[in-house]
Structures are given as structure tokens and as C-alpha cells.
């Protein structure tokens, strides 16, 4: 091993593995903006209805994961978990994120760069005013 490799090994042992764009990952439930198909706010996830944009994404796209904000009660998350299970899409409940307004994300396993990831309605506008 070279000195640089030993240095890197020691730093990773002390500080953990390096993470790209940690601020962005804190906002987007552990994933990157460039991978997101659809994002809902916490308020949108708490609504009784299931957003059709999320269902459409789950039904038509493969190689994706549903990320859910763990601060939201399970009753509000369960409808999205059932939809993901129906389409055999894996889901993750993220409970170690920092303060974020994001409640749900449907993300790819690679960069897709969707221009507008948010479902813009009254609840979204109230959240980000």
C-alpha cells in the first residue's frame, strides 16, 4: 500500500466513508436531486389521497426506490408502501435525516435529471412560500 492509500484508509476509519453532496442528501432523504422522479412534501404525504404522479411513476418505471420520511406517522405512509409493494418497488423509511420539508421521494438508481420533480399544488405552495 502506498502512503496515500494508507492515509485514506485511516481517515475513513476515523471519519467514516466519504459521501458526495451531504447537504443535498440531507434535504432529499439520503438520495441525490439528479436521481429523483417525483418528490412530495410532508403535508402532501399526510393527505388522504394518493398522488397520481407517484402511482404513475411506481407503475411505469423500474430500477427505482421509494424513500419515505420517518417523522411521518405510519398511517400516512402505509398507502404509499402498499402501492410500492404492489409494483414490487423497494422502499426505505429514512429516520436519520436532518430537518427537511420532503416527505416522499421516488428515485432512480442512477442520474435522470428530471427538470421538475415536485407536485405543485396548494400544499406545496404553502410549504415553500
Where are these regions (language model features)?
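Extracellular/luminal Protease-associated
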Residues: 58, 62-73
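Extended, non-globular alpha-helical segments
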Residues: 39-60
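N-terminal, charge-rich interaction modules
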Residues: 1-45
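Solvent-exposed alpha-helices and their adjacent loops that cap or buttress functional pockets
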Residues: 30-31, 58-59, 96-98
Amino acid at each position: 500500500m502506498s502512503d496515500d492509500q494508507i492515509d485514506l484508509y485511516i481517515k475513513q476509519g476515523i471519519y467514516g466513508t466519504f459521501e458526495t453532496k451531504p447537504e443535498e442528501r440531507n434535504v432529499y432523504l439520503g438520495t441525490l436531486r439528479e436521481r429523483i422522479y417525483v418528490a412530495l412534501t410532508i403535508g402532501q404525504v399526510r393527505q388522504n389521497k394518493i398522488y397520481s404522479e407517484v402511482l404513475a411513476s411506481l407503475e411505469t418505471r423500474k430500477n427505482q426506490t421509494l424513500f419515505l420520511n420517518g417523522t411521518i406517522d405510519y398511517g400516512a405512509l402505509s398507502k404509499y408502501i402498499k402501492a410500492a409493494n404492489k409494483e414490487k418497488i423497494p422502499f426505505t423509511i429514512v429516520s436519520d435525516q436532518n430537518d427537511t420539508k420532503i416527505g416522499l421521494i421516488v428515485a432512480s438508481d442512477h442520474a435522470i435529471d428530471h427538470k421538475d420533480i415536485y407536485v405543485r399544488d396548494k400544499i406545496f405552495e404553502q410549504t415553500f412560500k
